[in-house]
Amino acid sequence: MSQNIVYSLTALMALLPASIYPYHRIAGQGADGRSAYFWGALVLGFAGPAAWALTQVAGRWHTGLSTALWITIAACMLLFMAMSALTRSAWRLSPLLLPYLLTVGAFATLAQQAPAPVVRGGAPGIWIDLHIAVSVITYALLTMAAVASLAAFLQERALKSKRPTPLTRFLPPVTESERMQLHLLGASEAVLGAGLATGMAVLYYETGALLRADHKTLLSVASFVVIGGLLLAHARTGVRGRMAARLVLIAYLLLTLAYPGVKFVTDVLLG
């Protein structure tokens, strides 16, 4: 077993306590369930992936699928910790978010042996670093928006069927989920717009062109349009519920195909 696999498995195990926390009987203890165990599990779940991701990119950026996924997991954990500290209901998204991140971590571990090319290009390093940082933040924000949207969908369905489950009793109320979804989508749209702008700047430095009609660009623009359309529709007609959830998940799927999806094809299938 290679050293990298061992490190990746260690980062994966660091996510396990946080992933099982919502399903453990102690989840109802402490301040609204946010006990010392909860915060300790979140810190561990952030520290493991973050340390491993920083080790892989130390000195220079690698564009491999596994590295990108670990960076994304660390960013999502950090954002979730901040939201849990600043709001009353965000921590209740943990039954949906944390097992999902554990699954992504398992996939990152399986992809550890895939090629991890180093970023090269003619653009100044600051522009490349800025573009990568903005892309990671965008994906983390939209991940949280998709989770909040899924929570609202599950709650709405349980209310209509009058059959709540232990999961829906744990999740935030519909209004809280939709409020978080809207705020996260607004932030995602702003940061994604900045990401498209920095991407154009990097491409201009490298090729002299502002746009390139590749899969990543087209899917990113499509995500920007879908999110913008949803925000506009919400402002004008108050669209919400299942329709809003579907549009958010479509935007998340498009952005997933644009970032991890393209890396999966180039690094794993074609690598």
Curated annotation (Swiss-Prot):
Residue spans crossing the bilayer: none
Pfam family, one: Cytochrom_C_asm
Protein name as annotated: Uncharacterized 28.8 kDa protein in nifR3-like 5'region
Stored InterPro entries: Cyt_c_assembly (IPR002541), YpjD/HemX (IPR052372)
GO cellular component: plasma membrane
GO BP terms in the entry: cytochrome complex assembly
An annotated Gene Ontology molecular function: heme binding
